[in-house]
Amino acid sequence: MSHTPFLCYKSLLVNATWGFAKGLATGEVRSRPFLWLVTAALTGGIVMSLELAAFRLYAPYFGYSIYVWGTMISVVMAALALGYALGGWLADRSRSGTILYVVIVSSGIYQLAVLFVERSILRWLWQSGEFFGTTIASLIIFVPTMTALAVTAPFVIRLLARAEHIGITAGKVYAFSTAGSIAGILITAFYLVPRLGTRMTLQILCASTLLVGASGLVRKSAAAAVIFLPAIGVLLLPKLTYSPAVLWTTESAYNWVAVMHQDDLRWLVLNHPAYSQTTRKVGAIWSGYYSDDFALGPTLVPARRMLALGLGAGGAITSTLAVAPHLQVDAVEIDPKVAEVAAKYFGLPLGQSNLSVHIADARPWLASSSQTFDLIQVDIYQGGPYIPFYLVTREFFEEASSHMNPGGLLMMNVYDTSGSRELLAATAATLKLVFPSLFVISRSDGNHVVLAFPREISVADIRQRLSRVDGETALHAIAAQAADKVQELIPPAGTTVFTDDRAPVEEITRRMLHSSR
Protein backbone atom coordinates (compact mmCIF):
# COMPACT_ATOMS: atom_id res chain seq x y z
CA MET A 1 0.00 0.00 0.00
CA SER A 2 1.34 3.42 -0.95
CA HIS A 3 2.12 5.77 1.94
CA THR A 4 1.88 8.95 -0.19
CA PRO A 5 -1.78 9.76 0.71
CA PHE A 6 -1.00 9.30 4.41
CA LEU A 7 2.03 11.61 4.23
CA CYS A 8 -0.04 14.24 2.41
CA TYR A 9 -2.82 14.03 5.00
CA LYS A 10 -0.38 14.18 7.89
CA SER A 11 1.39 17.16 6.33
CA LEU A 12 -1.95 18.92 5.85
CA LEU A 13 -2.94 18.25 9.46
CA VAL A 14 0.41 19.44 10.80
CA ASN A 15 0.58 22.62 8.72
CA ALA A 16 -3.05 23.61 9.24
CA THR A 17 -3.03 23.05 12.99
CA TRP A 18 0.36 24.66 13.52
CA GLY A 19 -0.71 27.69 11.49
CA PHE A 20 -3.87 28.07 13.56
CA ALA A 21 -2.02 27.70 16.87
CA LYS A 22 0.68 30.13 15.74
CA GLY A 23 -1.97 32.61 14.69
CA LEU A 24 -3.48 32.49 18.15
CA ALA A 25 -0.13 32.99 19.81
CA THR A 26 0.95 35.91 17.60
CA GLY A 27 -2.41 37.62 17.59
CA GLU A 28 -3.16 36.99 13.94
CA VAL A 29 -6.30 35.13 15.00
CA ARG A 30 -8.05 37.38 17.49
CA SER A 31 -11.69 36.43 17.15
CA ARG A 32 -12.52 34.27 20.15
CA PRO A 33 -16.12 33.71 18.98
CA PHE A 34 -14.78 32.36 15.69
CA LEU A 35 -12.41 30.06 17.60
CA TRP A 36 -15.31 28.76 19.69
CA LEU A 37 -17.41 28.01 16.60
CA VAL A 38 -14.51 26.22 14.92
CA THR A 39 -14.01 24.24 18.12
CA ALA A 40 -17.66 23.15 18.00
CA ALA A 41 -17.24 22.04 14.39
CA LEU A 42 -14.02 20.12 15.04
CA THR A 43 -15.24 18.35 18.17
CA GLY A 44 -18.45 17.40 16.35
CA GLY A 45 -16.37 15.89 13.57
CA ILE A 46 -14.11 14.02 16.00
CA VAL A 47 -17.11 12.51 17.81
CA MET A 48 -18.58 11.13 14.59
CA SER A 49 -15.19 9.89 13.41
CA LEU A 50 -14.66 8.08 16.70
CA GLU A 51 -18.08 6.48 16.40
CA LEU A 52 -17.36 5.16 12.90
CA ALA A 53 -13.90 3.97 13.91
CA ALA A 54 -15.43 2.15 16.88
CA PHE A 55 -17.48 -0.12 14.62
CA ARG A 56 -14.34 -1.13 12.75
CA LEU A 57 -12.41 -1.57 15.98
CA TYR A 58 -15.10 -3.91 17.34
CA ALA A 59 -15.64 -5.97 14.18
CA PRO A 60 -12.88 -8.58 14.79
CA TYR A 61 -14.21 -9.21 18.30
CA PHE A 62 -17.99 -8.80 18.20
CA GLY A 63 -18.79 -8.86 14.48
CA TYR A 64 -20.70 -6.42 12.30
CA SER A 65 -24.29 -7.23 13.22
CA ILE A 66 -27.09 -4.73 13.73
CA TYR A 67 -26.91 -5.56 17.46
CA VAL A 68 -23.34 -4.32 17.70
CA TRP A 69 -24.25 -1.15 15.84
CA GLY A 70 -27.39 -0.59 17.93
CA THR A 71 -25.59 -1.16 21.22
CA MET A 72 -22.69 1.07 20.28
CA ILE A 73 -24.92 3.92 19.11
CA SER A 74 -27.02 3.72 22.29
CA VAL A 75 -23.97 3.91 24.54
CA VAL A 76 -22.56 6.82 22.54
CA MET A 77 -25.87 8.69 22.75
CA ALA A 78 -25.86 8.20 26.52
CA ALA A 79 -22.30 9.58 26.66
CA LEU A 80 -23.32 12.61 24.60
CA ALA A 81 -26.35 13.25 26.82
CA LEU A 82 -24.12 13.14 29.89
CA GLY A 83 -21.64 15.47 28.21
CA TYR A 84 -24.31 17.99 27.26
CA ALA A 85 -25.57 18.12 30.84
CA LEU A 86 -22.03 18.42 32.21
CA GLY A 87 -21.18 21.11 29.66
CA GLY A 88 -24.14 23.24 30.66
CA TRP A 89 -23.28 22.90 34.34
CA LEU A 90 -19.62 23.85 33.77
CA ALA A 91 -20.49 26.74 31.46
CA ASP A 92 -22.68 28.42 34.06
CA ARG A 93 -19.80 28.29 36.54
CA SER A 94 -17.04 29.58 34.27
CA ARG A 95 -16.26 33.09 33.08
CA SER A 96 -14.00 32.02 30.20
CA GLY A 97 -13.45 29.17 27.80
CA THR A 98 -10.30 27.93 29.52
CA ILE A 99 -12.05 25.09 31.32
CA LEU A 100 -13.58 23.95 28.01
CA TYR A 101 -10.19 23.51 26.40
CA VAL A 102 -8.82 21.78 29.49
CA VAL A 103 -11.66 19.26 29.18
CA ILE A 104 -10.91 18.76 25.46
CA VAL A 105 -7.21 18.19 26.18
CA SER A 106 -8.17 15.67 28.87
CA SER A 107 -10.22 13.84 26.24
CA GLY A 108 -7.15 13.64 24.02
CA ILE A 109 -5.00 12.37 26.88
CA TYR A 110 -7.57 9.66 27.62
CA GLN A 111 -7.62 8.65 23.96
CA LEU A 112 -3.83 8.39 24.03
CA ALA A 113 -3.92 6.12 27.07
CA VAL A 114 -6.59 3.92 25.49
CA LEU A 115 -4.47 3.41 22.36
CA PHE A 116 -2.11 1.26 24.45
CA VAL A 117 -4.76 -0.99 26.03
CA GLU A 118 -7.78 -1.12 23.69
CA ARG A 119 -6.86 -4.43 22.04
CA SER A 120 -6.22 -6.08 25.40
CA ILE A 121 -9.63 -4.90 26.62
CA LEU A 122 -11.36 -6.26 23.50
CA ARG A 123 -9.56 -9.61 23.69
CA TRP A 124 -10.72 -9.88 27.30
CA LEU A 125 -14.33 -9.14 26.33
CA TRP A 126 -14.66 -10.87 22.95
CA GLN A 127 -16.49 -13.91 24.32
CA SER A 128 -18.91 -11.80 26.37
CA GLY A 129 -21.45 -11.51 23.55
CA GLU A 130 -22.55 -8.72 21.27
CA PHE A 131 -24.56 -6.72 23.80
CA PHE A 132 -22.53 -7.13 26.99
CA GLY A 133 -19.14 -7.07 25.28
CA THR A 134 -19.93 -4.02 23.16
CA THR A 135 -21.47 -2.17 26.11
CA ILE A 136 -18.54 -2.72 28.48
CA ALA A 137 -15.97 -2.00 25.76
CA SER A 138 -17.72 1.26 24.88
CA LEU A 139 -18.00 2.32 28.51
CA ILE A 140 -14.25 1.88 28.94
CA ILE A 141 -12.86 2.95 25.56
CA PHE A 142 -15.19 5.64 24.25
CA VAL A 143 -17.63 6.98 26.87
CA PRO A 144 -15.14 9.13 28.86
CA THR A 145 -13.66 10.80 25.79
CA MET A 146 -17.02 11.34 24.06
CA THR A 147 -18.56 12.73 27.23
CA ALA A 148 -15.70 15.22 27.44
CA LEU A 149 -16.08 16.24 23.79
CA ALA A 150 -19.86 16.64 24.17
CA VAL A 151 -19.22 19.36 26.75
CA THR A 152 -18.32 21.66 23.85
CA ALA A 153 -21.73 22.56 22.36
CA PRO A 154 -23.50 23.84 25.51
CA PHE A 155 -20.30 25.51 26.69
CA VAL A 156 -19.85 27.40 23.41
CA ILE A 157 -23.52 28.41 23.43
CA ARG A 158 -23.03 29.90 26.90
CA LEU A 159 -19.86 31.74 25.87
CA LEU A 160 -21.44 33.23 22.75
CA ALA A 161 -24.76 34.00 24.43
CA ARG A 162 -23.09 36.73 26.44
CA ALA A 163 -22.75 38.72 23.22
CA GLU A 164 -25.70 37.52 21.12
CA HIS A 165 -29.32 36.42 21.38
CA ILE A 166 -29.60 32.87 22.70
CA GLY A 167 -31.67 31.54 19.79
CA ILE A 168 -29.27 32.80 17.15
CA THR A 169 -26.35 31.56 19.22
CA ALA A 170 -27.71 28.04 19.66
CA GLY A 171 -28.60 27.77 15.99
CA LYS A 172 -25.14 28.92 14.94
CA VAL A 173 -23.35 26.50 17.28
CA TYR A 174 -25.39 23.49 16.23
CA ALA A 175 -24.97 24.42 12.56
CA PHE A 176 -21.18 24.47 12.94
CA SER A 177 -21.20 21.29 15.03
CA THR A 178 -23.37 19.45 12.51
CA ALA A 179 -21.23 20.62 9.59
CA GLY A 180 -18.20 19.27 11.43
CA SER A 181 -19.98 15.98 12.06
CA ILE A 182 -20.78 15.61 8.36
CA ALA A 183 -17.16 16.30 7.45
CA GLY A 184 -15.98 13.82 10.08
CA ILE A 185 -18.23 11.08 8.72
CA LEU A 186 -17.16 11.60 5.12
CA ILE A 187 -13.43 11.89 5.85
CA THR A 188 -13.46 8.82 8.09
CA ALA A 189 -15.65 6.66 5.87
CA PHE A 190 -14.06 7.51 2.52
CA TYR A 191 -10.45 8.19 3.46
CA LEU A 192 -9.15 7.49 6.94
CA VAL A 193 -10.40 3.96 7.65
CA PRO A 194 -10.14 2.51 4.11
CA ARG A 195 -6.69 3.98 3.41
CA LEU A 196 -5.01 4.26 6.78
CA GLY A 197 -6.79 1.66 8.92
CA THR A 198 -8.54 1.87 12.29
CA ARG A 199 -5.39 2.21 14.38
CA MET A 200 -4.00 5.19 12.47
CA THR A 201 -7.47 6.75 12.34
CA LEU A 202 -7.70 6.63 16.13
CA GLN A 203 -4.19 8.09 16.42
CA ILE A 204 -5.11 10.97 14.10
CA LEU A 205 -8.29 11.65 16.08
CA CYS A 206 -6.34 11.61 19.33
CA ALA A 207 -3.80 14.09 17.95
CA SER A 208 -6.59 16.27 16.55
CA THR A 209 -8.33 16.37 19.93
CA LEU A 210 -5.14 17.44 21.70
CA LEU A 211 -4.54 20.15 19.11
CA VAL A 212 -8.08 21.52 19.36
CA GLY A 213 -7.71 21.70 23.12
CA ALA A 214 -4.30 23.34 22.82
CA SER A 215 -5.64 25.98 20.43
CA GLY A 216 -7.75 27.49 23.18
CA LEU A 217 -5.00 27.47 25.80
CA VAL A 218 -1.85 28.73 24.14
CA ARG A 219 -0.73 32.32 24.49
CA LYS A 220 2.88 32.05 23.36
CA SER A 221 4.67 30.20 20.57
CA ALA A 222 6.75 28.22 23.08
CA ALA A 223 3.63 27.07 24.88
CA ALA A 224 2.08 26.11 21.56
CA ALA A 225 5.08 23.93 20.74
CA VAL A 226 4.97 22.20 24.12
CA ILE A 227 1.43 20.94 23.47
CA PHE A 228 1.72 20.66 19.69
CA LEU A 229 4.75 18.36 19.49
CA PRO A 230 3.41 15.57 21.77
CA ALA A 231 0.17 15.62 19.77
CA ILE A 232 2.04 15.04 16.53
CA GLY A 233 4.07 12.35 18.30
CA VAL A 234 0.85 10.34 18.67
CA LEU A 235 0.94 9.81 14.90
CA LEU A 236 4.31 8.10 15.23
CA LEU A 237 3.19 5.38 17.64
CA PRO A 238 4.25 1.92 16.42
CA LYS A 239 1.91 -0.22 14.37
CA LEU A 240 0.07 -3.13 15.93
CA THR A 241 1.76 -6.51 15.91
CA TYR A 242 -0.20 -9.71 15.32
CA SER A 243 0.31 -13.33 16.30
CA PRO A 244 2.55 -15.50 14.09
CA ALA A 245 -0.63 -17.21 12.81
CA VAL A 246 -1.55 -14.01 10.94
CA LEU A 247 0.13 -14.26 7.55
CA TRP A 248 -1.33 -11.03 6.17
CA THR A 249 -3.89 -8.47 7.27
CA THR A 250 -5.42 -5.22 6.07
CA GLU A 251 -8.52 -3.09 6.38
CA SER A 252 -10.78 -2.18 3.50
CA ALA A 253 -13.91 -0.08 3.21
CA TYR A 254 -15.93 -3.18 4.10
CA ASN A 255 -13.90 -5.58 6.23
CA TRP A 256 -11.00 -6.33 8.47
CA VAL A 257 -9.31 -8.96 6.31
CA ALA A 258 -6.80 -11.50 7.61
CA VAL A 259 -5.08 -14.53 6.13
CA MET A 260 -4.21 -17.06 8.82
CA HIS A 261 -1.92 -20.05 8.54
CA GLN A 262 -0.79 -23.01 10.61
CA ASP A 263 1.50 -25.71 9.25
CA ASP A 264 0.26 -26.31 5.69
CA LEU A 265 -3.26 -24.95 6.31
CA ARG A 266 -4.37 -21.48 5.28
CA TRP A 267 -7.71 -19.76 5.93
CA LEU A 268 -9.41 -16.42 5.39
CA VAL A 269 -11.01 -14.41 8.21
CA LEU A 270 -13.33 -11.46 7.66
CA ASN A 271 -14.10 -9.30 10.72
CA HIS A 272 -14.74 -12.07 13.25
CA PRO A 273 -11.84 -14.45 14.09
CA ALA A 274 -14.18 -17.24 15.20
CA TYR A 275 -15.53 -17.72 11.67
CA SER A 276 -13.34 -18.59 8.69
CA GLN A 277 -14.40 -18.20 5.07
CA THR A 278 -12.22 -20.86 3.44
CA THR A 279 -9.78 -23.35 4.93
CA ARG A 280 -7.53 -25.23 2.57
CA LYS A 281 -4.08 -26.76 2.36
CA VAL A 282 -1.62 -24.61 0.46
CA GLY A 283 -1.75 -25.52 -3.22
CA ALA A 284 -4.74 -27.86 -2.82
CA ILE A 285 -8.00 -27.65 -4.76
CA TRP A 286 -10.23 -29.50 -2.29
CA SER A 287 -10.76 -28.29 1.26
CA GLY A 288 -12.76 -31.07 2.88
CA TYR A 289 -15.36 -28.47 3.90
CA TYR A 290 -18.74 -27.37 2.60
CA SER A 291 -17.25 -25.31 -0.25
CA ASP A 292 -16.42 -28.60 -1.99
CA ASP A 293 -20.15 -29.34 -2.25
CA PHE A 294 -20.57 -26.39 -4.62
CA ALA A 295 -18.50 -28.32 -7.17
CA LEU A 296 -21.40 -30.77 -7.46
CA GLY A 297 -23.40 -28.15 -9.37
CA PRO A 298 -22.17 -29.09 -12.88
CA THR A 299 -22.96 -32.76 -12.14
CA LEU A 300 -26.56 -31.90 -11.24
CA VAL A 301 -27.42 -29.63 -14.18
CA PRO A 302 -25.88 -29.03 -17.62
CA ALA A 303 -24.00 -25.79 -17.06
CA ARG A 304 -22.18 -23.46 -19.41
CA ARG A 305 -22.41 -20.21 -17.44
CA MET A 306 -22.20 -19.76 -13.67
CA LEU A 307 -22.71 -16.83 -11.31
CA ALA A 308 -21.01 -16.79 -7.91
CA LEU A 309 -22.38 -14.22 -5.46
CA GLY A 310 -19.71 -13.82 -2.81
CA LEU A 311 -16.11 -14.69 -3.53
CA GLY A 312 -14.44 -15.26 -0.18
CA ALA A 313 -11.13 -17.00 -0.79
CA GLY A 314 -12.52 -18.49 -3.99
CA GLY A 315 -12.75 -22.06 -2.70
CA ALA A 316 -16.11 -22.86 -4.30
CA ILE A 317 -15.09 -21.35 -7.64
CA THR A 318 -11.72 -23.10 -7.69
CA SER A 319 -13.23 -26.52 -7.02
CA THR A 320 -16.10 -25.96 -9.48
CA LEU A 321 -13.69 -24.97 -12.27
CA ALA A 322 -11.61 -28.07 -11.52
CA VAL A 323 -14.70 -30.17 -12.28
CA ALA A 324 -15.98 -28.07 -15.19
CA PRO A 325 -13.09 -26.11 -16.74
CA HIS A 326 -15.34 -25.09 -19.65
CA LEU A 327 -17.62 -22.99 -17.40
CA GLN A 328 -17.85 -19.26 -17.99
CA VAL A 329 -17.88 -17.82 -14.47
CA ASP A 330 -18.97 -14.38 -13.27
CA ALA A 331 -18.09 -13.74 -9.62
CA VAL A 332 -19.45 -10.76 -7.69
CA GLU A 333 -17.53 -9.56 -4.63
CA ILE A 334 -18.11 -6.26 -2.86
CA ASP A 335 -14.61 -6.00 -1.36
CA PRO A 336 -11.63 -5.57 -3.72
CA LYS A 337 -9.24 -6.62 -0.96
CA VAL A 338 -10.98 -9.99 -0.69
CA ALA A 339 -10.53 -10.56 -4.42
CA GLU A 340 -6.87 -9.62 -4.07
CA VAL A 341 -6.41 -12.11 -1.22
CA ALA A 342 -8.18 -14.90 -3.11
CA ALA A 343 -5.70 -14.59 -5.97
CA LYS A 344 -2.54 -13.95 -3.95
CA TYR A 345 -2.91 -16.44 -1.11
CA PHE A 346 -5.49 -19.01 -2.26
CA GLY A 347 -4.65 -19.50 -5.91
CA LEU A 348 -7.85 -18.16 -7.49
CA PRO A 349 -7.02 -18.03 -11.23
CA LEU A 350 -8.01 -14.43 -11.92
CA GLY A 351 -6.06 -14.46 -15.18
CA GLN A 352 -8.23 -17.13 -16.79
CA SER A 353 -10.32 -15.90 -19.70
CA ASN A 354 -13.41 -17.73 -18.44
CA LEU A 355 -13.39 -16.07 -14.99
CA SER A 356 -14.61 -12.49 -14.54
CA VAL A 357 -14.65 -10.88 -11.09
CA HIS A 358 -16.97 -7.90 -10.63
CA ILE A 359 -16.35 -5.62 -7.64
CA ALA A 360 -19.89 -4.71 -6.65
CA ASP A 361 -22.70 -5.38 -4.19
CA ALA A 362 -24.36 -8.64 -5.20
CA ARG A 363 -27.99 -7.62 -5.40
CA PRO A 364 -27.60 -4.29 -7.25
CA TRP A 365 -25.23 -6.00 -9.68
CA LEU A 366 -27.74 -8.76 -10.30
CA ALA A 367 -30.55 -6.26 -10.85
CA SER A 368 -28.49 -4.39 -13.45
CA SER A 369 -27.29 -7.49 -15.30
CA SER A 370 -28.95 -8.82 -18.44
CA GLN A 371 -27.16 -12.19 -18.29
CA THR A 372 -28.82 -15.50 -17.52
CA PHE A 373 -27.08 -18.42 -15.85
CA ASP A 374 -27.33 -22.17 -15.57
CA LEU A 375 -25.82 -22.25 -12.11
CA ILE A 376 -25.95 -19.65 -9.33
CA GLN A 377 -23.89 -20.00 -6.14
CA VAL A 378 -24.70 -17.83 -3.11
CA ASP A 379 -22.33 -17.75 -0.13
CA ILE A 380 -22.28 -14.29 1.44
CA TYR A 381 -21.76 -13.40 5.10
CA GLN A 382 -20.80 -10.27 6.99
CA GLY A 383 -19.54 -9.84 10.50
CA GLY A 384 -19.20 -13.57 11.12
CA PRO A 385 -22.32 -15.75 10.86
CA TYR A 386 -24.75 -13.07 9.64
CA ILE A 387 -26.25 -13.24 6.14
CA PRO A 388 -26.99 -9.74 4.78
CA PHE A 389 -30.77 -9.65 5.14
CA TYR A 390 -31.46 -8.38 1.62
CA LEU A 391 -29.77 -11.46 0.13
CA VAL A 392 -32.20 -13.94 1.67
CA THR A 393 -35.58 -12.34 0.94
CA ARG A 394 -38.38 -13.33 -1.40
CA GLU A 395 -37.60 -10.36 -3.65
CA PHE A 396 -33.95 -11.38 -3.92
CA PHE A 397 -34.78 -14.96 -4.84
CA GLU A 398 -37.27 -13.71 -7.43
CA GLU A 399 -34.51 -11.56 -8.92
CA ALA A 400 -32.13 -14.54 -8.95
CA SER A 401 -34.78 -16.73 -10.56
CA SER A 402 -35.28 -14.19 -13.35
CA HIS A 403 -31.59 -14.59 -14.23
CA MET A 404 -31.72 -18.39 -14.27
CA ASN A 405 -32.12 -20.58 -17.33
CA PRO A 406 -35.04 -23.08 -17.22
CA GLY A 407 -32.84 -26.07 -16.45
CA GLY A 408 -30.74 -24.25 -13.88
CA LEU A 409 -29.87 -24.61 -10.20
CA LEU A 410 -29.35 -22.20 -7.30
CA MET A 411 -26.98 -23.37 -4.55
CA MET A 412 -26.79 -21.47 -1.28
CA ASN A 413 -24.83 -22.01 1.91
CA VAL A 414 -26.80 -21.44 5.13
CA TYR A 415 -24.91 -21.54 8.42
CA ASP A 416 -27.18 -22.78 11.21
CA THR A 417 -25.90 -24.67 14.26
CA SER A 418 -29.14 -24.53 16.26
CA GLY A 419 -31.10 -27.63 17.11
CA SER A 420 -34.29 -26.11 15.71
CA ARG A 421 -32.68 -25.14 12.39
CA GLU A 422 -34.79 -21.96 12.52
CA LEU A 423 -32.66 -19.98 10.06
CA LEU A 424 -32.47 -22.88 7.61
CA ALA A 425 -36.24 -23.36 7.83
CA ALA A 426 -36.98 -19.66 7.26
CA THR A 427 -34.61 -19.57 4.29
CA ALA A 428 -36.29 -22.67 2.89
CA ALA A 429 -39.78 -21.22 3.40
CA THR A 430 -38.71 -18.12 1.49
CA LEU A 431 -37.04 -20.09 -1.30
CA LYS A 432 -40.10 -22.32 -1.61
CA LEU A 433 -42.15 -19.33 -2.77
CA VAL A 434 -39.93 -19.12 -5.86
CA PHE A 435 -38.35 -22.54 -6.36
CA PRO A 436 -40.66 -25.59 -6.30
CA SER A 437 -37.97 -28.17 -5.44
CA LEU A 438 -35.62 -27.78 -2.48
CA PHE A 439 -32.96 -30.13 -1.11
CA VAL A 440 -30.18 -29.78 1.42
CA ILE A 441 -26.76 -31.32 2.05
CA SER A 442 -25.99 -30.77 5.74
CA ARG A 443 -22.60 -31.04 7.41
CA SER A 444 -21.86 -31.51 11.09
CA ASP A 445 -20.14 -28.10 11.33
CA GLY A 446 -23.46 -26.31 10.80
CA ASN A 447 -23.08 -25.51 7.10
CA HIS A 448 -26.04 -26.51 4.94
CA VAL A 449 -25.78 -26.31 1.15
CA VAL A 450 -29.30 -25.77 -0.18
CA LEU A 451 -30.19 -26.90 -3.72
CA ALA A 452 -33.06 -24.93 -5.27
CA PHE A 453 -34.50 -26.01 -8.63
CA PRO A 454 -36.97 -23.93 -10.68
CA ARG A 455 -38.83 -27.14 -11.63
CA GLU A 456 -40.13 -30.30 -10.01
CA ILE A 457 -37.43 -32.88 -9.27
CA SER A 458 -37.17 -35.74 -6.75
CA VAL A 459 -34.48 -36.68 -4.27
CA ALA A 460 -34.07 -39.94 -6.21
CA ASP A 461 -33.16 -37.89 -9.29
CA ILE A 462 -30.53 -36.03 -7.27
CA ARG A 463 -28.98 -39.24 -5.97
CA GLN A 464 -28.99 -40.79 -9.43
CA ARG A 465 -27.11 -37.84 -10.90
CA LEU A 466 -24.59 -37.89 -8.08
CA SER A 467 -23.99 -41.60 -8.62
CA ARG A 468 -22.83 -40.91 -12.19
CA VAL A 469 -19.71 -39.09 -11.01
CA ASP A 470 -16.57 -40.87 -12.26
CA GLY A 471 -15.16 -43.14 -9.57
CA GLU A 472 -11.60 -42.17 -10.47
CA THR A 473 -12.04 -38.45 -9.85
CA ALA A 474 -11.51 -36.52 -6.62
CA LEU A 475 -15.16 -35.49 -6.77
CA HIS A 476 -16.37 -39.08 -6.47
CA ALA A 477 -16.01 -39.24 -2.67
CA ILE A 478 -17.70 -35.86 -2.29
CA ALA A 479 -20.58 -36.95 -4.52
CA ALA A 480 -20.97 -40.26 -2.67
CA GLN A 481 -21.08 -38.48 0.68
CA ALA A 482 -23.59 -35.96 -0.68
CA ALA A 483 -25.80 -38.75 -2.06
CA ASP A 484 -25.98 -40.24 1.44
CA LYS A 485 -26.77 -36.92 3.11
CA VAL A 486 -29.02 -35.14 0.62
CA GLN A 487 -32.66 -34.89 1.61
CA GLU A 488 -35.68 -32.92 0.61
CA LEU A 489 -35.98 -29.62 2.46
CA ILE A 490 -39.55 -29.06 3.63
CA PRO A 491 -40.12 -26.02 5.87
CA PRO A 492 -42.68 -26.47 8.67
CA ALA A 493 -46.06 -24.80 8.21
CA GLY A 494 -46.15 -21.24 9.50
CA THR A 495 -42.38 -20.72 9.20
CA THR A 496 -41.23 -17.11 8.91
CA VAL A 497 -40.81 -15.85 5.35
CA PHE A 498 -38.18 -13.18 4.72
CA THR A 499 -39.17 -10.11 2.70
CA ASP A 500 -37.45 -6.80 2.00
CA ASP A 501 -39.92 -5.21 4.42
CA ARG A 502 -39.30 -7.66 7.25
CA ALA A 503 -36.39 -10.08 7.44
CA PRO A 504 -35.41 -10.84 11.07
CA VAL A 505 -32.21 -12.60 9.98
CA GLU A 506 -30.09 -11.01 12.70
CA GLU A 507 -32.60 -11.89 15.42
CA ILE A 508 -32.79 -15.54 14.35
CA THR A 509 -29.02 -15.77 13.97
CA ARG A 510 -28.55 -14.29 17.42
CA ARG A 511 -30.85 -16.91 18.92
CA MET A 512 -28.88 -19.57 17.07
CA LEU A 513 -25.60 -18.31 18.51
CA HIS A 514 -26.98 -18.25 22.05
CA SER A 515 -28.41 -21.76 21.73
CA SER A 516 -25.03 -23.05 20.56
CA ARG A 517 -23.14 -21.80 23.63
Model-predicted regions and their roles:
Residues 456-517:
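SAM/dcSAM-binding transferase cores
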Residues 347:
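A motif-centric feature for acidic-aromatic and gly/ser/thr-rich catalytic loops and repeats
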